[in-house]
Curated annotation (Swiss-Prot):
Gene: htpG
Subunit (UniProt): Homodimer.
UniProt KW keywords: ATP-binding, Chaperone, Cytoplasm, Nucleotide-binding, Stress response
Coiled coil (UniProt feature): none
The protein, known as: Chaperone protein HtpG
One Pfam family of this chain: HSP90
Family (UniProt): Belongs to the heat shock protein 90 family.
InterPro entries: HATPase_C_sf, Heat_shock_protein_90_CS, HSP90_C, Hsp90_fam, Hsp90_N, Ribosomal_Su5_D2-typ_SF
Function: Molecular chaperone. Has ATPase activity.
Annotated organism of origin: Paramagnetospirillum magneticum (strain ATCC 700264 / AMB-1) (Magnetospirillum magneticum)
UniProt GO cellular component terms: cytoplasm
Localization per record: Cytoplasm
Ranges where the record places region A: 1-326
Region (C): 544-623
Highest taxon above the source species: Bacteria
Amino acid sequence: MAEEKRQFQAEVGKLLDIVVHSLYSNKEIFLRELISNASDSCDRLRYGAITEPDLLDGDSEFRIRLVPDKDAGTLTIIDNGQGMSHDELIANLGTIAKSGTSEFLARLTGDAKKDVSLIGQFGVGFYSAFMVAEEVTVTSRKAGEAKGWKWVSDGKGEFTVSPAEDAARGAAITLKLREGETEFLDAFRLKSIVKRYSDHIAIPVTLKDADKDEETINSASALWTRSKSEITPEQYKEFYHHVAHAFDEPWSTLHYKAEGAIEYTGLLFIPSSKPLDIFHPDRKQHVKLYVRRVFITDDCEELLPPYLRFVRGVVDSQDLPLNVSREMLQHNPVLSKIRTGLVKRILGELKKKSEDAEGKYDEFWAAFGPVLKEGIYEDFERKTDILELCRFRSTHGDGLTTLADYVARMKDGQDAIYTITGDDLDQLKKSPQLEGFAAKGVEVLLLTDPIDEFWVSAVRSYAEKDFRSVAAAGADLSKVKAPEGAEDKKADEAPADELTTLIEAVKLALGERVKDVRPSERLTESAVCLVAAEGEMSMHLEKMLRAHNQAPGERARILEINPRHALIKGLAARVKAGGTDAGLEDAAFLLLDQARIIEGEPPADPAAFARRMVSVMEKGLLG
């Protein structure tokens, strides 16, 4: 087969340009990335060989070799892992297969420290080789296949793939170093890099320097099997970088050994930065499962619930069989008990952190709060534990609050925890539905995450207090006393008979466009607002479902009018005096459209809305 010449995917070309010219301020990281990839390759073959031992072909001692050649100016990183086929070389090295590539490129800031973390999250550490190499050659043969392949590129837009004679199983990555990068041929320098970044790799990393004997230069023991007292914070951090493919600092580290009926070791990390794929629809978790130090899978859905998918790390079981299949894991009682133990530990760690006076928990909440809240809806058994970990914005100041603190601040006569949902915090604060609550000093939780709509309706109560939306018709503040000195609202209302006549006229004009028209107890400044009938889905939830084509159609809502507002009083007086002309009908539609706009909805008929606005302005300005 002749040599094939191919172009890099466009996004890869942009990435390579960033990597080579501006991204990494610490070039030695390339070696960590290549060793980490080699380790993953060996782990995957070790697992595959449990059921297909012939894949090993008599070579079962996994290792990673570093071979510097000062005369040729090359550094070669060799592993005897699973290797890559022809198509895998093209797919893995010529494209970024992970979703969200465009978002990744859009989020590059030019700040090396921030951008390097994005590189790691996308699993493209291989391209870091071009920081120090003017040409990269990958020679690889996949385990179980007879033919090997060679991939070559200078990182400038294209690469070639050709057959490779006598290729060994695994991969050999040869870097033709750039001028000025020869420090990476020095044995002492290579040893120090491996010691710093890759000492935790459980597979031996060896160095063959010229005519000297080959030597192992890492500890080659699984970090999680060591005692905590033997592990430094720096070693924990570097292991996190390896297992999470991340460059940020771990926000929290949890290392423990469970003993008893079920034995396992967990080394878990909570990142400090939000991964780009945290809201990907597959909600994949990222904790690697080992059985007696043999890698099994990094895609075990049963290991942790989706609402803890931000956790990174490893779990090593002593009780699962080595030949366990992914299908067997789905209903395995041992794994179920491990999952229960892990969730309890993680939630316990979060509880401890949330009680820390230093305020670092707010950093965690900003990154992962929306994900953790999924557990309120999905994990009914632990809903109270998770609710107590939650933090919320509210009308009580600018900071975050707990539900316990909210309940402690409830007013005399207040029998519910009041909420309002929406997309934007600033817009929620301006919602007319809040006016009556503010007037009586009643705090309202401001919920802006999509999951909020679901857990509030599912949980219903906390500390024997129901959750109630201020945008629903059932919100009743009649039992809550107004602050001393507050004006008597009833004294300033439109006369009851005039108001009744106006309401009937508005109902007649709007017809089925509204479910009802009512005088409002919640409005103090605005003329109108829309509310959902008791038991109906909120307007915000309906809007979300419509955006995903999951709502049957727009529902008619209740239009509340403020009997104390000058406009409403004026309209009421006009109707009582016999004014039922087209001007009143226009006013009714404008009131409804105003209420819709406040809710972030467009007028039902924009052209008619514009015509009515012009008509009203003409009468007001021109007489």
